[in-house]
Amino acid sequence: MTARVLMFQGTGSDVGKSLMVAGLARAFTRRGLSVVPFKPQNMSNNAAVTADGGEIGRAQALQARAAGVPLSVHMNPVLLKPQSETGAQVVVQGKIVGSAKAADYQHMKAGLMPRVLDSFEHLKQLADLVLVEGAGSASEINLRANDIANMGFARAADAPVILIGDIDRGGVIASLVGTREVLDDDDAAMIEGFIVNRFRGDPALFSDGMRMIAEKTDWSSIGLLPHFSDAAKLPAEDALGLSGPAQRKPSAKIRIAVPILPHISNFDDLDPLDMEPDVELIRVRPGETIPADCRLVLLCGSKSTIADLAVLKDAGLDIDIKAHVRRGGYVLGLCGGYQMLGKTVADPDGIEGPPATVEGLGLLDVDTVLTGDKRLVSVRGTSFDGVGLSGYEMHVGETTGIAGSLVFSTIDGHADGTISPDGRVFGTYIHGLFADDRQRSAWLERLGGQGTDLNYDAQVDAVLDRLAAHMEQHLDLDRLLAIAR
């Protein structure tokens, strides 16, 4: 088979492209179509492991889940993982090919288009419909040369485009009409419809606005999509999701402090905890202190462990964490957070930056050496308390000193992670720990709460079903299928 194609681009970042594709993937799948998601280029430190040992953006993993299809590196052939303000690791078809500064990457892009189109053609043979997500803003004409993410891809793949604007942030008419004005005619001709997303209030009050947009752009209106409140219950890919206020839960019995460091990665590890009614996550930014009543300090993964460790120390959070342990609190480090808890972190080959060896927090008797080889694998095993676990590993670096120590878990016969002698500090390389209902329940009990009866996977699927129904009600899905080609 050769699939029909439909691409969704946005007037800016975080206008709802990822969830639009996820919801439509579930909606069209429920109509009996086979659907696969595709994003030519993604920038995110939240990644998922594919069955063939590669990695793709977490948004594409959620979209694949919505469509009921296994993950493939071809769903996100170019993944950029920021390592600094100006540079990123470049992952092509699931494998690291190097790192590049922003200016250098602009020259790399022309050579990446053949790989992008190769992945796209591969997916077209597997489904009835390919739903493509653009990146950032369609109107970034300064980046149009060698573009592989938006109009450059749409033109190369002959993919009709639906443009999404976010009315919740204001100025949606200007952003949609303005996009039409700055695009050249050939690019603008690829856009065949528009969606106004995240509307609040009486839709009748914006009927004139929808008409004006259509008149000024000559695009079809696909619909005015009301705000979907349950969107917060789905995994967020971008760190933008961490920049807003946290969900307050005054009656929560368990408070967990999460340092928000500049290169935090795989922070979707927090989502299952956030869904628990008895858990309140406290985001602690540099310059803030860890509340004394928190039961657990959770150090998430990091794309730049040494740099984030320096920020943590400069902010005095290392002192806070050690005081938390002295008060009898728990600390759990995941992946990069685990590395920070050890005695030293060494980067002799300059994997993350200039070669260096730095002192860790010294709360675990381990040392880490960062290496060029990356471990990407889904895992199953048993944790130290005999509870089963499933998750995935995604890291560079080898951590030694585990022999003779209490190990966190046993994975396929080998030891993972370690525990301090007093049983208060834990470190593991396993991501997805709290998405495992067994592990999450055990940790809630350890922290003084009750085990959970919440089925996280079922909750996510239920939200995807509601999102699909929301789109069926408010968008013209038949028109979308007619536009797809």
From Swiss-Prot:
Q: Which residues form the GATase cobBQ-type domain?
A: 253-439
Metabolic or biological pathway: Cofactor biosynthesis; adenosylcobalamin biosynthesis
Statement: the UniProt record of this protein carries the keyword Aminoacyl-tRNA synthetase: no
Pfam families recorded for this chain?
CbiA, GATase_3
Tell me which PROSITE patterns the record gives: GATASE_COBBQ (PS51274)
Which keywords fit this entry according to its UniProt record?
Cobalamin biosynthesis, Glutamine amidotransferase
Gene Ontology biological-process annotations: cobalamin biosynthetic process
- Gene3D superfamilies per record: 3.40.50.880, P-loop containing nucleotide triphosphate hydrolases
UniProt cross-references to InterPro entries, sorted A to Z: Class_I_gatase-like, CobQ/CobB/MinD/ParA_Nub-bd_dom, CobQ_GATase1, CobQ_synth, GATase_3, P-loop_NTPase
Q: Which GO molecular function annotation, any one, does this entry have? A: ABC-type vitamin B12 transporter activity
- Active-site residues from the entry: 335, 431
Any keyword Translocase?
A: no
Q: Which family does it belong to?
A: Belongs to the CobB/CobQ family. CobQ subfamily.
Q: What PANTHER family does UniProt report for this protein, alphabetically?
A: COBYRIC ACID SYNTHASE, DETHIOBIOTIN SYNTHETASE
Which NCBIfam families does the record associate with it? Answer: cobQ, PRK00784.1
Write out the function statement from the record.
Answer: Catalyzes amidations at positions B, D, E, and G on adenosylcobyrinic A,C-diamide. NH(2) groups are provided by glutamine, and one molecule of ATP is hydrogenolyzed for each amidation.
Q: This chain belongs to which protein, by name?
A: Cobyric acid synthase
| Source species | Agrobacterium fabrum (strain C58 / ATCC 33970)
